């Protein structure tokens, strides 16, 4: 019975180890996605600054009417809104990354608990083996004693 329970504990340790490997892969993927998003955001930021400068230089020595000024302002606003969306995506991915780290920590705690329980049952199995061996020695001694008693009386 104890051996079967120990086997269950071993399986739980194996399952917890597998969960950690899976979670580590998820964490690495989340980290990679976040890094890519940060790089995209940084690249876009630099491009946006250059693009705003280019648009400004185009209009620098020209007379702007209200319609052209509004169009230019909309272009700039659109560029900045897109940059804000990139930054928002980075923030969301950073939050997901933190969640994946928390899940990994939880998996590690579960593995630690599973190993602790497995070790307890391993000790119980060891004690049971020891008790069985002692019982076997005792039984052998009893049989030997009976044999000697029987031959003395005969």
Swiss-Prot record:
Region (Disordered): 132-154
Domain of life: Bacteria
Alphabetized Gene3D superfamilies for the sequence: 1.10.287.1700
Keywords associated with the record: Plasmid, Virulence
The keyword Transport belongs to this UniProt entry's keyword annotation: no
Recorded family membership: Belongs to the SpaM family.
Name of the molecule in the record: Yop proteins translocation protein O
Organism: Yersinia pseudotuberculosis serotype I (strain IP32953)
């Amino acid at each position: 019975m104890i051996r079967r329970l120990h086997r269950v504990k071993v399986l739980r340790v194996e399952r917890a180890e597998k969960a950690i490997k899976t979670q580590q892969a998820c964490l690495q993927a989340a980290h990679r996605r976040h890094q890519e998003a940060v790089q995209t955001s940084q690249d876009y930021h630099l491009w946006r600054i250059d693009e705003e400068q280019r648009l400004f230089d185009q209009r620098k020595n020209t007379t702007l009417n209200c319609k052209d000024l509004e169009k230019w302002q909309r272009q700039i606003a659109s560029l900045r809104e897109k940059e804000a969306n990139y930054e928002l995506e980075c923030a969301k991915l950073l939050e997901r990354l933190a969640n994946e780290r928390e899940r990994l920590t939880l998996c590690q705690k579960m593995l630690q608990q599973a190993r602790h329980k497995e070790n307890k049952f391993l000790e119980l199995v060891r004690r049971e083996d020891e008790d069985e061996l002692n019982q076997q020695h005792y039984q052998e001694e009893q049989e030997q004693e009976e044999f000697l008693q029987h031959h003395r009386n005969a």
